[in-house]
């Protein structure tokens, strides 16, 4: 027991007897769930008192059924609360926000309603306790007696420090000095009260009136219900007002009858004058009559059939009617406020409509503009009245919740927009978080032709038409529907909007600000390149529109001339199938063997797409026809897979040899697809059928596993080895026996017998290999070059723009503020900030760090003081320090081992060397002090 008690104390925490739960601690002890609710962390004690870790089943139950009061009523942390521990209340101390304690309080409120009705009734109509009613009173009193005891164990909120006080002594002292006396007095049984009171005060209900003290619980209940989102505020307020009215009528009726019942002359009372034998009448008739007079007095109707007959009743009526004045004012004020609040939106809408109409008439606006004004105001009222104030709601939420909502609603829609095809999910998530949903009524202008490009829109629902003004008349150029984007050309190219965008029906649009968009793209240059490619491709498809054709012509002209310092790669040009741009890039000295992160070169992409002109250009500029990617694939294999015969011929003439790639992989793929034509092509262009994959599996292994007799026979005809083992030691012959392929076993036996008798000649796979036609040509090794287009000055650099018609022509747009200019500036800034890590961007926009030679020409001076050479020699910096030491050995006929600066610091990395540095090559025996002395 001692050990168990120690464990319990450890679980409750070593915080001492006067420990109090802070506001920040209490808030951290409640975990807010996604459904807007929270659950209290287990506290010590039987009411959610865990033993340190807590019961998982209990936690799940609390999590599922936790009340929203934990958020609306729980303690909020003070600013800068530093406590990060989960404080637990003391043993046997109950949190006032515990779910089960809330249930207990709700149950007591039901008993309070009973007490509120029965206490005045017993006081006015019942002379002494009788049977069932007395028993029910005692049962109710017993429950409230339990609550008195329980209150001594409920923590309270200190109003000064806003901390939960869980010290039992302080809890007891606070309760004893506040409400304990009234709670005990209202719980005393009526029988006991009659015995202790004087004879003149031994009325059955006199002491019971103290139970009305419990009504304070009902007031707190209505306060909570008014804040509860699950209950309608209007009906909660109405229910509260009705309860107040009924309680006032009930109490007044009981007091009216009490005055008549206790008056010495029964006939001189309000009820005796109307009903002389009222004592003989049933309790129900007497109660209904009393309520009738009470409610007629409350409503000031006053039929005159019942009225005060003596002084006592007159005095009571005076105070009752004064009370009625205040109650009536309270009721009318509350109901007026509720009704006015419900109609305020309609009143504001009518006022706004009237003001807009007057404005249009006063300023003689065209009818179309007036209709647009009225439609917009009407739509705004409709969205507000139907609870669609989406932007106001989103703006009131934290950024994380707002982003999650936007992603859930619009992510898939934005992902399918042509402009963002192929970009990363991170970019789409950032864009969606910045978008704002808006509603537009039919026939409203969203974008005006020639206005400044500030926003572009994505259609969520509805349709819009693109209108161009020609000869003073509007002509519909195109109709856009859900999932399409409008206004993007003006925003991305930073030019006046080309068209007027007008809604055809009720539309929901996503608006994205140009500044926010370019800010996001500037930090995602690779994705910006993809967006640029998608835009150009879209514009090229709009050949029928002269305006769009002019835009794409100007963009491509600037790209080809190199006027934009953009991260354009050969892969980018080949992916678009733009042989003109590819030729311009190659003429400017870009490496034809540059690759992306997967090792794909431009020749790989051109071969797979079957673009003969791009393949021819790349081969002419020295692209390696046998370049391998990370999977061992070569361009010739890409062309064979796609059945591009002309490209295959070009590659073979350029020296392509399939054996440079992973022919084992190729043969296995052909067998898996059961493609005899592809397998014959592999063998014809230099593939070895006996070559294994990385796991040791050959094509014959694959054919046996698939039970493909046709492919196995074809492989055997070209020299496949039936006894070659894979990585696990299995041969094709053993696999055929193990898997029970009788046809293949028979084929193997017949082939072996024919080979042994010498009657069958097995052709070697090398006998059919095609000799390269251009093997003598020297090929440049493939490396990851920097795909950067240099700025070059041309005579035609200032050609006028031919995009807009003559009558709409503006001054020439420099594109510095367009998407292209932003990407260009961002790329240049990155190179300035990181000169040692310059790299290209592949067609997908992913960074491709340079793994080849240094692109910048760096000249350094090297000297060897040990050989008496201090003047030095000017040389180009090699790629590595080892190569630099080898160069020094050749220049000075000396074997240096270290590279030092003139100050004597040793150089460990070649990237630390800058253009113009003076380097000293020395051996391990060299004394740095000698160099300092000489210097």
Curated annotation (Swiss-Prot):
One Pfam family cited in the UniProt record for this chain: Ank_2
Intramembrane segments: 289-308
Keyword Ion transport applies: yes
Residue spans of the ANK repeats: 565-594, 598-627, 631-660, 662-691, 695-724, 728-757
Keyword Membrane carried by entry: yes
Membrane-spanning ranges: 107-127, 137-157, 179-199, 206-226, 241-261, 313-333
Disulfide bonds: none
Ranges of residues in domain KHA: 859-935
Key words of the record: ANK repeat, Ion channel, Ion transport, Membrane, Potassium, Potassium channel, Potassium transport, Repeat, Transmembrane, Transmembrane helix, Transport, Voltage-gated channel
Gene Ontology CC terms, in alphabetical order: monoatomic ion channel complex
Functional note: Highly selective inward-rectifying potassium channel that mediates potassium uptake by plant roots.
Subunit structure: The potassium channel is probably a homo- or heterotetrameric complex of pore-forming subunits.
Name of the protein in its database record: Potassium channel AKT1
Lineage, highest ranks first: Eukaryota, Viridiplantae, Streptophyta, Embryophyta, Tracheophyta
């Amino acid at each position: 027991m001692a050990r168990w008690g120690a464990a319990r104390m450890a679980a409750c925490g070593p915080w001492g007897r006067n420990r109090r739960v802070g506001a920040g601690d209490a808030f951290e002890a409640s975990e807010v769930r996604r459904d807007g609710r929270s659950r209290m962390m287990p506290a010590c004690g039987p009411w959610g008192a865990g033993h340190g870790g807590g019961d998982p089943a209990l936690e799940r139950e609390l999590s599922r059924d936790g009340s929203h009061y934990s958020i609306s009523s729980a303690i909020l942390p003070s600013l800068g609360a530093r406590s990060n521990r989960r404080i637990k209340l003391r043993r046997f101390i109950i949190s006032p926000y515990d779910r089960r304690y809330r249930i207990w309080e709700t149950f007591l409120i039901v008993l309070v309603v009973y007490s509120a009705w029965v206490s005045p009734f017993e006081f006015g109509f019942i002379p002494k306790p009788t049977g069932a009613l007395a028993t029910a009173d005692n049962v109710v009193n017993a429950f409230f007696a339990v609550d008195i005891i329980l209150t001594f164990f409920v923590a309270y909120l200190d109003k000064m420090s806003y901390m939960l006080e869980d010290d039992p002594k302080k809890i007891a002292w606070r309760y004893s000095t506040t409400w304990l006396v009234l709670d005990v007095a209202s719980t005393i049984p009526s029988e006991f009260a009659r015995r202790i009171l004087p004879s003149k005060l031994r009325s059955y209900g006199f002491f019971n009136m103290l139970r009305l003290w419990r009504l304070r619980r009902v007031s707190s209940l209505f306060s909570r219900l008014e804040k509860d989102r699950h209950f309608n505020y209007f009906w909660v307020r109405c229910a509260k007002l009705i309860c107040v009215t009924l309680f006032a009528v009930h109490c007044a009726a009981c007091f009216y009858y009490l005055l008549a019942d206790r008056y010495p002359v029964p006939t001189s009372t309000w009820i005796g004058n109307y009903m002389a034998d009222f004592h003989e009448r049933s309790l129900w008739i007497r109660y209904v009559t009393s309520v009738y007079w009470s409610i007629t007095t409350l409503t000031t109707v006053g039929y005159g059939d019942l009225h005060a007959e003596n002084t006592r009743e007159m005095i009571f009526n005076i105070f009752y009617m004064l009370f009625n004045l205040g109650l009536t004012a309270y009721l009318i004020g509350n109901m007026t406020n509720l009704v006015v609040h419900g109609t305020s939106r309609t009143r504001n809408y009518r006022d706004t409509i009237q003001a807009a109409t007057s404005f249009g008439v006063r300023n003689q606006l065209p009818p179309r503009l007036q209709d647009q004004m009225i439609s917009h105001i009407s739509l705004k009222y409709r969205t507000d009245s139907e609870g669609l104030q989406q932007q106001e709601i989103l703006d009131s939420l934290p950024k994380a919740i707002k982003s999650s909502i936007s992603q859930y609603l619009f992510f898939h829609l934005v992902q399918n927009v042509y402009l963002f095809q192929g970009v990363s999910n991170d970019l789409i998530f950032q864009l969606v978080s910045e978008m704002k949903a808006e509603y537009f009524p039919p026939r409203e202008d969203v974008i005006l032709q020639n206005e400044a490009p500030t926003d572009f829109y994505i259609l969520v629902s509805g349709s819009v038409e693109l209108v161009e003004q020609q000869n003073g008349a509007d002509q519909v150029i195109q109709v856009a529907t859900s999932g399409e984007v409008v206004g993007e050309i003006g925003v991305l190219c930073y030019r006046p909007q080309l068209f007027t965008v007008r809604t055809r029906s009720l539309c929901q649009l996503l608006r994205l600000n140009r500044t926010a968009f370019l800010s996001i793209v500037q930090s995602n240059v690779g994705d910006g390149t993809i967006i640029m490619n998608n835009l150009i491709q879209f514009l090229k498809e709009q050949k029928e529109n002269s305006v769009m054709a002019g835009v794409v012509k100007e963009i491509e002209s600037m790209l080809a001339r190199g006027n934009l310092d953009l991260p354009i790669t050969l892969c980018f040009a080949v992916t678009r199938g733009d042989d003109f741009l590819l030729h311009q890039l190659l003429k400017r000295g870009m490496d034809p063997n540059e690759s992306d992160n997967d090792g794909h070169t431009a020749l790989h992409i051109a071969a797979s797409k079957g673009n003969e002109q791009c393949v021819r250009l790349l081969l002419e500029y020295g692209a390696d026809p046998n370049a391998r990617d990370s999977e061992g694939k070569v361009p010739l294999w890409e062309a064979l897979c796609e059945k591009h015969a002309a490209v295959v011929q070009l590659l073979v003439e350029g020296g392509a040899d399939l054996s440079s790639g992973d022919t084992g992989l190729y043969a296995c793929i052909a067998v898996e697809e059961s493609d005899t034509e592809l397998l014959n092509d592999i063998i014809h262009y230099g593939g070895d059928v006996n070559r294994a994959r990385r796991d040791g599996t050959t094509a014959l292994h694959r054919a046996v596993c698939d039970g493909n007799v046709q492919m196995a026979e074809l492989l055997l005809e070209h020299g496949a080895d039936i006894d070659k083992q894979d990585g696990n030691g299995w041969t094709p012959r053993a696999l055929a026996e193990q898997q029970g392929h009788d046809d293949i076993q028979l084929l193997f036996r017949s082939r072996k017998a024919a080979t042994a008798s010498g009657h069958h000649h097995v052709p070697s796979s090398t006998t059919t290999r095609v000799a390269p036609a251009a093997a003598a040509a020297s090929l440049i090794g493939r490396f990851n070059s920097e795909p950067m287009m240099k700025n070059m000055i041309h005579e035609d650099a200032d050609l006028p723009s031919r995009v807009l018609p003559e009558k709409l022509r503006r001054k020439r747009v420099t594109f510095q503020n367009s998407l292209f200019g932003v990407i260009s500036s961002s790329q240049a800034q990155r190179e300035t900030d990181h000169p040692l890590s310059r790299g290209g961007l592949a067609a997908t926009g992913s960074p491709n760090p340079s793994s080849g030679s240094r692109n910048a020409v760096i000249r350094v001076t090297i000297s060897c003081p040990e050989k008496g050479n201090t003047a030095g020699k000017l040389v180009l910096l090699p790629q590595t320090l080892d190569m630099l030491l080898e160069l020094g050995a050749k220049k000075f006929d000396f074997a240096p081992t270290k590279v030092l600066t003139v100050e004597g610091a040793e150089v460990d990395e070649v990237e630390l060397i800058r253009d113009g540095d003076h380097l000293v090559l020395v051996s391990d025996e060299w004394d740095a002090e000698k160099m300092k002395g000489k210097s």
